[in-house]
Amino acid sequence: MSEKFSGGCDHINTHSSSDPIDNHTCHCSVCKRVTGQPTTHVAFFNHGDLEVDNPQKMNKQPFNDQNPDGPLELCTCSECGTPIMLDDKLGRIRAIVPNIMGYDEGFPAPTYHAFYDPATGVPRPDDGREVYEGLRKDFVWPPEK
């Protein structure tokens, strides 16, 4: 099957022939800290659907430095430092941030807003997409591997 999506850097390639299982604009404080962006486009894939070429070249560190034992690890290239993906230690998902992880501008747009917190004082998004304080209500985490 041909690849629908491909990203990464000159040393590590990630690719998938499957659609993401979730595709949202994230408003969480962790994404803001890690990316430096006010909101972050995040796409989740089933763990086995996002393949990695040359995984031995990845450095892994906790995605959330305030919860270093959490399940998500930020994977970066050991040669150039490019962020490659988020890997779930439980084997459920792999996630990408298309605009900083080497994906082209044709990547599908986010379908909703996740982790919006009105207490931050940031105006509620009004672009016509649903807004949730967590992930969308019908999202089901894949089973652990």
List PLM regions with ranges:
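A short Gly-Trp-Pro
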Residues: M1-S6, I12-K145
